[in-house]
Structures are given as C-alpha cells and as structure tokens.
Amino acid sequence: MNKKTKRMKKIKEHINFAKLHHIDETIDLLKKSSTVKFNESIDIAINLGINSKKSDQNIRSSTVLPNGIGRSIRVAVFTQGDNIAIAKDAGAELIGMEDLSEKIKKEGVDFDVVIATPDAMKIVTQLGQILGPRNLMPNTKLGTITTNIAEAIKNAKTGQVRYRNDKNGIIHATIGRINFHKNEIKENLNVFLESIKKAKPPQSKGIYIKKIVLSTTMGVGLMVDQSTLSL
C-alpha cells in the first residue's frame, strides 16, 4: 500500500459518512483528503424532489459563478457578418458557419461551449449527433442562442455553469477547484443553489432540495447540512 493510499485510508477512518457536515467542515475535510498532485475539481450532486419522468418537472438552466470554476473555457461560435469581429474580440477560439461545421465533422470536438446566433441554428442543428450527446447544443434557456454574442462569450469564459437533472432527479456540476479559498467555494455554492431554487418547477411538491453532496475528483463525497448554508 503506497503512502497516498495509506493516508486516504487513515482520513476515511476519521470521517463519518452518514453525518451531515457543516459547510465549513465539509470544505476543510475535502481539502485535507486531497492526495493527488493535480488541482482537483470540487463537484456537487443535488438530489431534488422532482419526478424526472414528467417533462414539466425536468430542470435545465445555467448560472454564472462569481469565482469561476478554475479552468479555461474554449468557446465555439456560429455566426456571420459583423458578429465575427465581435466574437473574436470577446475571446472565442472558433468562429464560423459552414466552415466551422465541416471542421467539427472532420476533427471532432475541442471546445467546451457552443454559442450561436439565431440565423446560424440551421447549420448547428445538423451537428445534433455530435453536439447533443455532449450536452453542447445551443439553447435559448441557457443563453447560448443569442444575438448578444459578446455577453454570452463573457459568461462562458467567466464561470457560467450549465446544468440539468439526470433520470434520477440529481443535478451534477463543478463549482470550483480544491485550491480555491473556502469563501470562494462558499460564494460559488450559494449562487449555484440560488439558481437551483429559482429553477424549481411549480409542479414539484414536498421537499425540493433533498440532499447535497460535495466531493472532489478523486476524493470522498460528504453530505452537507443545509441549515449551515445561506438558503
């Protein structure tokens, strides 16, 4: 057993995984239990009181985290005319129409977000089999189908997180990195949870946010005591 495995085993022996942890304790334990050399992401899983089998209770939205998520985001923009210069000035890595579509078909996906102006969607929809499974298809709700290209690129670059529930009614997202200051993680978490609350379907009854778990890429997952959050 190597040193990292021994350290992780020792840490796990002192963690009560059945306990609801204060948010400060949760972050401290996640930082303490990080044993890998790379900067792990801090991920959140939220169990919601929704019926995912009913389309009117499924959630799909986005929010911009105040402290970003700790990594650079590559943006592809489908647009034309004057918007090409605007997209370039805003920092988009890939810009085009049919030419960009052909590039993606031949070379695959090497970007994190796709943004499109409405007039470009006829081309983008033809990439459905490529973009759809990767959850990259532009969407009006997410602000990725827009006439305001500059704002959409800025949001994507500065910490916009897109989310949707899975078939079990759970939302998964990244809200930061292990090297973030505790307050930065808490600020991101509060903004994310506020967005989740606003996205609550009117048809959802009973307890809406049932469980919150924070974890790291290669580390442990801890349940958070919601009474210690700014909900």
Curated annotation (Swiss-Prot):
GO terms under cellular component: cytosolic large ribosomal subunit
Pfam families noted in UniProt: Ribosomal_L1
GO annotation (BP), single: regulation of translation
Keyword list, A-Z: Repressor, Ribonucleoprotein, Ribosomal protein, RNA-binding, rRNA-binding, Translation regulation, tRNA-binding
GO molecular function, one term: structural constituent of ribosome
Taxonomic superkingdom: Bacteria
Alphabetized InterPro entries for the sequence: Ribosom_uL1_bac-type, Ribosomal_uL1, Ribosomal_uL1-like, Ribosomal_uL1/biogenesis, Ribosomal_uL1_3-a/b-sand, Ribosomal_uL1_CS
Subunit structure: Part of the 50S ribosomal subunit.
Family: Belongs to the universal ribosomal protein uL1 family.
Summary of the function given for this chain in its UniProt record: Binds directly to 23S rRNA. The L1 stalk is quite mobile in the ribosome, and is involved in E site tRNA release.
Name of the protein in question: Large ribosomal subunit protein uL1
Source organism of this protein record: Buchnera aphidicola subsp. Acyrthosiphon pisum (strain APS)
Taxonomic lineage from the root: Bacteria, Pseudomonadati, Pseudomonadota, Gammaproteobacteria, Enterobacterales
Name of the coding gene: rplA
